[in-house]
Curated annotation (Swiss-Prot):
Entry GO MF terms: 6,7-dimethyl-8-ribityllumazine synthase activity
Record bears the keyword Transferase: yes
Protein name: 6,7-dimethyl-8-ribityllumazine synthase
Classification via InterPro entries: LS, LS/RS, LS/RS_sf
Native source organism of the sequence: Bacillus pumilus (strain SAFR-032)
Chain residues that bind (2S)-2-hydroxy-3-oxobutyl phosphate: A85, T86, R127
Gene Ontology biological-process entries: riboflavin biosynthetic process
Name of the gene this protein is made from: ribH
EC number: 2.5.1.78
Family that this chain belongs to: Belongs to the DMRL synthase family.
Catalytic activity: (2S)-2-hydroxy-3-oxobutyl phosphate + 5-amino-6-(D-ribitylamino)uracil = 6,7-dimethyl-8-(1-D-ribityl)lumazine + phosphate + 2 H2O + H(+)
Protein's UniProt keywords contain Transferase: yes
Length: 154
């Protein structure tokens, strides 16, 4: 039996990070975690491009555009959607998730879902570097692993 795993070594890989500006007091912390993880695992700072978009709903469009350039080994998406009093939350979460998955499948480039979907501001803060770790960092580690796996099958 053969086991194939991706390695968490970012040297020689190129990454794009799409970050939603909405709730930037959270998304900026996710970005810090992602950049730190990429650099600690050997990525060159010049091989990391960060693109800011207005909100989570706009993430899939930009992620797909970046993946289609064939410049990147992986695209990381970062955003924060916090439940409010209306159904807007449900639409944004569902469409962002669906759009990101469709973009990855249609381009053949790993696009990592790093969009927080939380019930409260407190939950978002916990996932941006306090109690529950930093989901931006976790997304970057997943991007490195998937980029290496993807190279295995080219």
């Amino acid at each position: 039996m053969n086991t194939i795993q991706g390695h968490v070594v970012a040297e020689g890989l190129k990454f794009a990070i799409v970050v939603a500006r909405f709730n930037d007091f959270i998304t900026s912390k996710l970005l810090d975690g992602a950049e730190d993880t990429l650099l600690r695992h050997g990525a060159n700072g010049d091989d990391i491009d960060v693109v800011w978009v207005p909100g989570a709903f706009e993430i899939p469009y930009m992620a797909k555009k970046l993946a289609e350039t064939e410049k990147y080994d992986a695209v990381i998406t970062l955003g924060t959607v916090i439940r409010g009093a209306t159904t807007h939350y449900d639409y944004v979460c569902n469409e962002a998730a669906k759009g990101i998955a469709q973009s990855a499948m249609s381009t053949g480039v790993p696009i990592i879902f790093g969009v927080l979907t939380t019930e409260s501001i407190e939950q978002a803060i916990e996932r941006a570097g306090t109690k529950a770790g930093n989901k931006g960092s976790e997304s970057a580690a997943a991007a490195i692993e998937m980029a290496n796996l993807n190279r295995t099958f080219r």
